[in-house]
């Protein structure tokens, strides 16, 4: 990733969208559902003792995980402290689970919960400054044979926005992601997809982006003139029969920590 991410700005933008995220983030919900399906395919059973979720947000993945698996202890981390409030209602419906919330930037935490047999993260790792260091820390915190499943985005993500405005995030290619993962884990599954959404207008695209927080690094104000220029260019470049398109390029990854003594 080029440059360092302004985590304070990311925190504020996502804090503002906590209430609208679940209703607007259809792609991220589909990614979370696929993450759960991957876990079911690669896990030896449906029971996990210690789970860590990185980037819990509004609780979209949290709820799916607790519905799909038997979990003893669940630790959720998010940059936005208010995520704890979103998760509380979910946890109240699962009193059998020992729950802990770990607020703050996961890259800056002095420690990570240890001996996790499952770590999950949905649509979050693209915000990290140093993915390799993070992968190493996660591997060190996991029990041998534990699974780490994550979704993120690859280099063609939101290519329409990048074509007009330039891109604030420089997404890694799937090859780059795979190379980093192989340094610390056995790669069980790594693939990418393309999801195209259709909106009635460029203005609807901007509303969608605003409500999901994926514009979290956008600093330049949207004047009427700038919005008109954006809309005119977007419509001329990316129109289709039903409106205009927006492309997502999700990545799905399942990793296993190598057994002690194995290469």
From Swiss-Prot:
<keyword id="KW-0949">S-adenosyl-L-methionine</keyword>
<keyword id="KW-0093">Biotin biosynthesis</keyword>
<comment type="function">
    <text>Converts the free carboxyl group of a malonyl-thioester to its methyl ester by transfer of a methyl group from S-adenosyl-L-methionine (SAM). It allows to synthesize pimeloyl-ACP via the fatty acid synthetic pathway.</text>
</comment>
<dbReference type="InterPro" id="IPR050602">
    <property type="entry name" value="Malonyl-ACP_OMT"/>
</dbReference>
<dbReference type="Pfam" id="PF08241">
    <property type="entry name" value="Methyltransf_11"/>
</dbReference>
<comment type="pathway">
    <text>Cofactor biosynthesis; biotin biosynthesis.</text>
</comment>
<keyword id="KW-0808">Transferase</keyword>
<keyword id="KW-0489">Methyltransferase</keyword>
<dbReference type="GO" id="GO:0008757">
    <property type="term" value="F:S-adenosylmethionine-dependent methyltransferase activity"/>
</dbReference>
<dbReference type="GO" id="GO:0010340">
    <property type="term" value="F:carboxyl-O-methyltransferase activity"/>
</dbReference>
<dbReference type="InterPro" id="IPR011814">
    <property type="entry name" value="BioC"/>
</dbReference>
<dbReference type="InterPro" id="IPR013216">
    <property type="entry name" value="Methyltransf_11"/>
</dbReference>
<dbReference type="GO" id="GO:0102130">
    <property type="term" value="F:malonyl-CoA methyltransferase activity"/>
</dbReference>
<dbReference type="GO" id="GO:0009102">
    <property type="term" value="P:biotin biosynthetic process"/>
</dbReference>
<comment type="similarity">
    <text>Belongs to the methyltransferase superfamily.</text>
</comment>
<protein>
    <recommendedName>
        <fullName>Malonyl-[acyl-carrier protein] O-methyltransferase</fullName>
        <ecNumber>2.1.1.197</ecNumber>
    </recommendedName>
</protein>
<dbReference type="GO" id="GO:0032259">
    <property type="term" value="P:methylation"/>
</dbReference>
<dbReference type="InterPro" id="IPR029063">
    <property type="entry name" value="SAM-dependent_MTases_sf"/>
</dbReference>
